[in-house]
């Protein structure tokens, strides 16, 4: 059976960026990676009451002793707390855990319907509150489509409606081209802790295709595309056919060049007195 690759890992450096931004010596890699896992785990544990309001946690390191943690949320007020109390507490907690200076920043999501993780979190939250999964998925799908998303796919898996056997249910609207690398696909996953067990929620949002200039990733340079008109009008002086006629790039001969080549060929025959 064909398996789905994560849309982010497939599009890294095409239209997606890393969620941990740092570069250190090979010997320190495992230690710093472990710290990143710890920071994300402790941050989500601290914000357990409002975990459905957090979309993403980005970690940036400029040096070994300073870490910047960027929390993306559509409700920054609930994350910051009264006079920044929550930020101060989580900062102190993480500093004790990894013995480094932590700087917490909040990034506001202005359009929650365009964020797949927030949509998945919202569905998981309502499933925990015993909402009907069929109505819930269809309403979430229509809400995102009405806001301008080009394609939506939502899938829930588990003991849906308290059924004895776990199964999956999926709804889809519009285009969701998972194999198109230039497609801007947003992906989110959440888990709903119900009385019957865990229900997994997956959301794919298609926001359009990333077009424009072609980028040469190897050289890190921008290649300017030539229009088709420029290509057809450009004359390649280095290409000459076996009769002395010059050839255009699109392999079409102009009338003027054909006559010129034919005349030069006849002159050559008369001069040498033999067929060529």
Curated annotation (Swiss-Prot):
Residues 218-243 are annotated as: Disordered. One of its GO terms (cellular component) is cytosolic small ribosomal subunit. It holds the Pfam family Ribosomal_S3_C. It comes from the Bacteria. SUPFAM superfamilies: Prokaryotic type KH domain (KH-domain type II), Ribosomal protein S3 C-terminal domain. Residues 227-243 have a biased composition (Basic and acidic residues). GO terms for molecular function: mRNA binding; rRNA binding; structural constituent of ribosome. One of its GO terms (biological process) is translation. Part of the 30S ribosomal subunit. Forms a tight complex with proteins S10 and S14. This is Small ribosomal subunit protein uS3. It comes from Borrelia hermsii (strain HS1 / DAH).
């Amino acid at each position: 059976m064909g398996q789905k690759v994560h849309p982010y890992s497939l599009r890294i450096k095409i239209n997606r960026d890393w969620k941990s931004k740092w570069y250190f010596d090979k010997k320190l890699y495992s230690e710093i990676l472990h710290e990143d896992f710890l920071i994300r785990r402790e941050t989500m544990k601290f914000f357990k009451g409002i975990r459905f309001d957090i979309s993403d946690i980005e970690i940036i390191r400029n040096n070994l002793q300073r870490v910047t943690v960027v929390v993306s949320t559509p409700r920054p007020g609930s994350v910051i707390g009264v006079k920044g109390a929550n930020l101060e507490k989580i900062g102190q907690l993480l500093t004790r855990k990894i013995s480094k200076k932590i700087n917490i920043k909040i990034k506001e999501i202005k359009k929650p319907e365009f964020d797949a993780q927030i949509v998945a979190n919202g569905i998981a939250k309502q499933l925990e509150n015993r909402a009907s999964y069929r109505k819930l998925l269809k309403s979430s799908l229509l809400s995102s489509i009405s806001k301008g998303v080009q394609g939506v796919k939502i899938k829930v898996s588990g003991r849906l409606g308290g059924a004895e056997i776990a199964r999956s249910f999926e709804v889809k609207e519009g285009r969701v081209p998972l194999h198109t690398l230039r497609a801007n696909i947003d992906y989110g996953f959440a888990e709903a802790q119900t009385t019957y067990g865990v229900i997994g929620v997956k959301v794919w949002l298609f926001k359009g295709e990333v077009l424009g200039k072609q980028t040469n990733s190897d050289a890190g340079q921008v290649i300017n595309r030539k229009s088709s008109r420029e290509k057809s009008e450009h004359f390649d002086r280095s290409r000459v056919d076996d009769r002395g006629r010059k050839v255009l790039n699109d392999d079409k001969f102009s009338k003027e060049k054909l006559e010129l080549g034919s005349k030069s060929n006849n002159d050559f025959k008369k001069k040498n007195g033999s067929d060529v």
